[in-house]
């Protein structure tokens, strides 16, 4: 189910035009892995790029990047192209990514999985087109079993509710086990994050979830056990990299 119309509402377009373009706009968890995985000449795919803010953030850390941003909103991509003509932006919908295997060194995706129930299909495609790293954020809880879905209001800056999309919280072990089952086997799975109240636009904004950033390092056919480093999360996992 496409949410292109919902994310093209004016309050969403205006919000991402004004926010999330500078390193100072990043959440603490977003500052941990991103500067460590960027290097001169890196080829980056940014999934859910909105108006292109992460291009500016990434080039602040590393000026020599080759950046491609994709988003389902025609309006957002139009703004990104106008603001950052030196980068590449594409409108695309659905779970299939229009790129060959191992095209990008880094596939980055933030503020998407918390509104997408089928994170598995997206993550599998991102892993496929990456040759080295996949960096994503996701909302997690321990021992909830099945995925929890509620409502997220497209209502930025205190205006009226223009539309609604899902707000998704996933089971921590289920997500980790899905990642560990990717082919080829990941070399490493690392994470950082903290408990925080849901976004104020969410239906249960007073409820705390683990705001999690996951860094998956892609393996190859000869990869052995996956290195698992989840110690920076306030959640205990019951998973094995064997």
Spans of features found by a protein language model:
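A short glycine-rich, Lys/Arg-flanked "PGG" loop and its adjoining helix->strand segment in the class I
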Residues: 120-133
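Class I SAM-dependent methyltransferase SAM/SAH-binding core
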Residues: 51-95
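Short conserved loop adjoining the S-adenosyl-L-methionine
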Residues: 96-101
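Short alpha-helix
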Residues: 164-191
């Amino acid at each position: 189910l496409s949410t292109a119309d919902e994310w093209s509402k004016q309050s969403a377009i205006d919000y991402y035009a004004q926010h999330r373009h500078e390193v100072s706009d990043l959440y603490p968890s977003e500052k941990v892995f991103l500067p460590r995985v960027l290097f001169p000449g890196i080829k980056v795919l940014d999934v859910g790029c909105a108006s292109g803010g992460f291009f500016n953030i990434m080039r602040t850390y590393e000026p020599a990047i080759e950046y491609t941003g994709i988003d389902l909103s025609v309006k957002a991509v139009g703004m990104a192209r106008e603001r950052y003509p030196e980068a590449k932006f594409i409108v695309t919908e659905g779970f299939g990514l229009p790129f060959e295997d191992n095209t990008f060194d880094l596939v980055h995706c933030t503020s998407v999985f918390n509104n997408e129930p089928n994170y598995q299909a997206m993550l599998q495609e991102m892993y496929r087109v990456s040759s080295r790293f996949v960096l994503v954020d996701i909302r997690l809880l321990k021992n909830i079993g099945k995925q929890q879905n509620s409502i997220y209001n497209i209502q930025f800056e205190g205006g009226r509710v223009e539309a609604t999309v899902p707000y998704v919280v996933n089971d921590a072990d289920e997500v980790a086990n899905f990642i560990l089952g990717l082919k080829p086997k990941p070399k490493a799975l690392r994470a950082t994050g903290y408990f925080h109240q849901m976004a104020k636009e969410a239906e249960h904004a007073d409820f705390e979830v683990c705001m999690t950033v996951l860094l998956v390092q892609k393996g190859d056919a000869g990869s052995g056990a996956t290195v698992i480093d989840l110690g920076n999360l306030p959640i205990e996992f019951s998973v094995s990299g064997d």
